């Protein structure tokens, strides 16, 4: 055995022997050692062996596999030192302060392994005294060590990931190692930054740990983290842009991974806010910082191809808590609208591609939906739609801007986003002010032209959403009905020369019967039937059937009387 010990000590110093041989010999000697002094020699040399640690740093699963097998076999074999003595001896070695930072970190890594393995009942059955000794030693080392970004990331991978490399489970028990979260905040943040800078495309563990840690922090500590995140984004985005466009890297996945990691962090904070019933000033401040973070991430939104429920949840939750949601409508959109109206010409889409147009789109969209839901539930009065001066200015110019923008919709892949941004801004202009005729005669035909142009670019469901959203925002029944009446009359003559687009509009407008007040529903159905007479008999029959189907989907009591009325006027016209 003495010869085997000398041999393995030599192998650990030698660079020419294969790693597989070195690890196998080390494993064998550690398993069969009878003398604690020799055990200390081998472990100390193992800690000092740089090439083994370089390999383990790149292959965490191999690192865990080595120690899992060793401790599992040590528990059941009678060779060498007893199991308890074996663990206590190694822990005693690892407790001693190392001569330099690198060796100190390697000692911490080995303590992490023993901590994880002693937490697994299938490896060690309730070895509480041993685990307590390891936990105490590990806690002391973590408190005093200054972790680099790489070390922090590696530490998180060891402490929070499953011992089984094939499992995706994450255990947060390791947070109990330190009595206060301040040191954890430092380690987790450092590990998260390192994760964003590296090529880990699948393993998002540092992000998950940061999300969990945020839930343990106070609101003011969360704000501090968000401020750091904004600073990080501002510094990192130029290099991420360069990396995505540089032919040497051309790595969109790297940047995409970072974008979704940041959104995960914001989602975690939004969820914590969503669960709160008593919203304080600090909570409102946090929500404003979350919104601000999204604006700073504008470039990254190119990775969102369509509506995303996670992002919608974050935005809606924060908007429901901030004091003035409208102030987040971007200055970029405002300036672009004013320029296009003043020039009375072509809308410069390149100018609109600046920050933060796409984020503004999401905000206005979710804000509109939030107000709709509140109005439906009658939890707020009409004053909720009071806008800031900037938002009012956008709204007053929005219709003309939307018309110009939609007419250019085929000239840019992003134009669909801008169409939505302008239309959702228009949804708030002059709602419910004045008499129906005074209000609508000025703007209704611009609305109609915008909707007509949208029939060329949007699918049926999107058009339904826009129409219904516009009508649902009226609390004045008379104005809501007048709006739909003028729309139907405007589209009626178009049937003769723009059949396809008119048909799409009439199919979409069927959904309006569900959102109108009961007093206006029957009149709307009468107007609808009158306005579709320009279609062929076959097309009219299809539209009549679609109206019947829409009515059947409504609540039973209302649907029964409406369906009876609808059938009576259809039969009456046929006769």
From Swiss-Prot:
Kindly state which keywords UniProt assigns to this record, in alphabetical order. Answer: Cytoplasm, Cytoskeleton
Q: GO CC annotations?
A: cell division site; cytoplasm; mitotic spindle; mitotic spindle pole body; nucleus; peroxisomal importomer complex
* Record GO terms (molecular function): protein-macromolecule adaptor activity
**Superkingdom to which the source organism belongs:** Eukaryota
The answer, when asked if Cytoplasm is one of the entry's keywords, is: yes
What Gene Ontology biological process does one annotation of this record name? protein import into peroxisome matrix
Where in the cell? Cytoplasm, Cytoskeleton, Microtubule organizing center, Spindle pole body
The protein's predominant localisation is cytoplasm
Q: What is this protein called?
A: Uncharacterized protein C323.03c
Taxonomic source organism = Schizosaccharomyces pombe (strain 972 / ATCC 24843)
């Amino acid at each position: 055995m003495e010869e085997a010990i000398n041999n393995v000590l030599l192998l650990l110093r030698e660079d020419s022997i294969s790693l597989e041989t070195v690890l196998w010999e080390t494993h064998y000697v550690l398993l069969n050692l009878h003398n604690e002094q020799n055990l200390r020699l081998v472990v100390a040399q193992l800690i000092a062996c740089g090439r083994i640690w370089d390999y383990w740093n790149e292959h965490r699963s191999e690192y865990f596999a080595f120690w899992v097998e060793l401790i599992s076999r040590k528990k059941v074999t009678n060779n060498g030192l007893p199991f308890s003595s074996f663990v206590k001896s190694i822990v005693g070695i690892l407790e001693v302060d190392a001569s330099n930072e690198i060796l100190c970190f390697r000692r911490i890594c080995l303590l992490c392994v023993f901590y994880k393995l002693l937490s697994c009942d299938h490896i060690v059955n309730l070895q509480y005294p041993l685990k307590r000794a390891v936990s105490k030693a590990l806690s002391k080392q973590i408190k005093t060590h200054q972790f680099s970004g790489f070390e922090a990331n590696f530490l998180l991978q060891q402490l929070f990931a499953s011992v089984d490399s094939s499992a995706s489970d994450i255990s947060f028990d390791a947070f109990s190692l330190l009595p206060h979260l301040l040191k954890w905040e430092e380690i987790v943040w450092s590990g998260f930054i390192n994760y964003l800078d590296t090529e880990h495309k699948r393993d998002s563990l540092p992000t998950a740990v940061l999300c969990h840690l945020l839930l343990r922090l106070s609101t003011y500590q969360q704000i501090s983290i968000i401020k750091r995140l904004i600073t990080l984004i501002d510094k990192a985005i130029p290099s991420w842009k360069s990396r995505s466009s540089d032919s040497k890297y051309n790595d969109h996945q790297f940047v995409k991974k970072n974008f979704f990691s940041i959104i995960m962090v914001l989602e975690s904070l939004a969820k914590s806010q969503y669960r709160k019933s008593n919203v304080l000033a600090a909570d409102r401040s946090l929500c404003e910082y979350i919104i601000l973070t999204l604006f700073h991430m504008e470039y990254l939104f190119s990775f969102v191809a369509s509506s995303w429920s996670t992002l919608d949840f974050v935005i809606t939750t924060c908007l429901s808590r901030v004091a003035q949601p409208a102030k987040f409508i971007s200055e970029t959109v405002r300036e672009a609208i004013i320029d296009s109206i003043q020039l009375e010409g072509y809308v410069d889409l390149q100018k609109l591609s600046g920050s933060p147009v796409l984020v503004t789109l999401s905000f206005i969209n979710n804000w509109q939906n939030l107000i709709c839901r509140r109005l439906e539930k009658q939890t707020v009065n009409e004053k909720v739609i009071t806008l800031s001066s900037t938002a009012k200015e956008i709204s007053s110019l929005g219709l003309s801007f939307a018309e110009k923008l939609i007419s250019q919709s085929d000239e840019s892949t992003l134009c669909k986003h801008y169409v939505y941004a302008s239309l959702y801004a228009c949804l708030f202009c002059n709602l419910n002010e004045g008499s129906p005729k005074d209000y609508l005669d000025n703007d209704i035909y611009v609305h109609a032209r915008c909707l007509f142009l949208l029939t060329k670019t949007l699918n049926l469901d999107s058009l339904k959403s826009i129409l219904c959203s516009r009508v649902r925002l009226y609390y004045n029944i008379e104005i809501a009905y007048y709006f739909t009446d003028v729309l139907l009359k405007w589209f009626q003559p178009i049937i003769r020369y723009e059949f396809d687009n008119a048909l799409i509009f009439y199919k979409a407008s069927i959904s309006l019967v569900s959102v109108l007040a009961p007093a206006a529903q029957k009149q709307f159905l009468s107007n609808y039937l009158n306005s579709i007479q320009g279609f062929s008999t076959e097309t009219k029959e299809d539209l009549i059937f679609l109206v019947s189907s829409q009515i059947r989907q409504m609540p039973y009591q209302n649907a029964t009387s409406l369906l009876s009325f609808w059938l009576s006027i259809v039969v009456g016209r046929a006769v």
